[in-house]
Amino acid sequence: MSLLLLVVSALHILILILLFVATLDKSWWTLPGKESLNLWYDCTWNSDNKTWACSNVSENGWLKAVQVLMVLSLILCCLSFILFMFQLYTMRRGGLFYATGFCQLCTSVAVFTGALIYAIHAEEILADRPSGGSFGYCFALAWVAFPLALASGIIYIHLRKRE
C-alpha cells in the first residue's frame, strides 16, 4: 500500500510540475528567428546582449480563455494534492478518495479545454504575427499533462484507504 501511495503522490507531483512549466514557461508557439510566444509574453532573443526581450501578448479573447483555464488547472491540481494529503491522514480505513479524484478529473478537463482552444484558435491568437512557426514544448507539455491528470483522477476514485 505504501508503494502505491508513493507512486500516486509522485504522479501527482509530476503533473504539477508539467502544469507549472506549461503555464509559466515561454514556448507555446515558436516562430523562425528565435522568437517564441507563451500565454503571457511575446519574447525575442537578443543575440547582442544574450537576453530575452519580452512584451505583453495580444488581448485576444481566446488567449484569455486559455490563460484562465491553465491557471484554473494549476489551482485545481494543487487543491487536489492538498485534499489528498488531508484525506490520507484524516479519513477512516476503507474510505475512498472521491473528492481528490473529482478535483483531478476537473484538472484534466481544464487542461484539455485550454490546449484544445489554443490549437483550434491558433490562427486568431497569432493573427498579428508573421506566418510560419509551430507549437512549442509548453503546448506539448499541456497535452502530456492531460492524460496523466485523467489517469490520476481515475486512480484516486478507485483508491481505497487501507492500514
Swiss-Prot record:
It comes from Bos taurus. Keywords: Glycoprotein, Membrane, Transmembrane, Transmembrane helix. This is Epithelial membrane protein 3. Its main location: membrane. Pfam families: PMP22_Claudin. It comes from the Eukaryota. Belongs to the PMP-22/EMP/MP20 family. The chain crosses the membrane at residues 4-24, 66-86, 100-120, 139-159. One of its GO terms (cellular component) is plasma membrane. Glycans are attached at N49, N56.
